[in-house]
Amino acid sequence: SELAKYFSMPASEIKNCRTYGGHGEQMAVFASTTELHGKKLSELIGTQIPAGDWEALRQRVIQGGKHIIDLRGRSSFQSPAYLSIEMIAAAMGGEAFRWPAGVYVHSEGFNHIMMAMETSITKDGVHYNAVKGSAEEMKTLEESYKHLCQLRDEVIAMGVLPPVKEWHALNPNID
């Protein structure tokens, strides 16, 4: 909705907006995947959208959840609930869910972590693909991954989760 507001255009004309990695402060917002009227957002930054405006917009996206809590005094459950229904429908054989979603990742340089990736949820399960973006976007995603690893390791240190090397004993599908 931030792009729709900024460009005064219907959200339906904005395609393939993507955020990956963690949530909130560590979210990786990708401009290179997004298209407005068939033009790449990354090509519009610095011309039709000044770099400073893009950075402010990107921060509003990152802070979106916090903003909802500030306004309501609680988190919003409607949007995640709606997306959950779409995911369940896809898993039950409906139309595939093809938005970034949290998934267990152990490849592409991201190991033993739950993070938002490019996914496809179908009746056959959840599959993810390597994320493609600019060098700067990939650096932001790497930083998000490192932050998530720190959080994972803190939870392991508290004894809530076993060490990563023991995860296979709990779930043979985890290498």
PLM region spans:
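Short, flexible loop segments at boundaries between secondary-structure elements
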Residues: 1
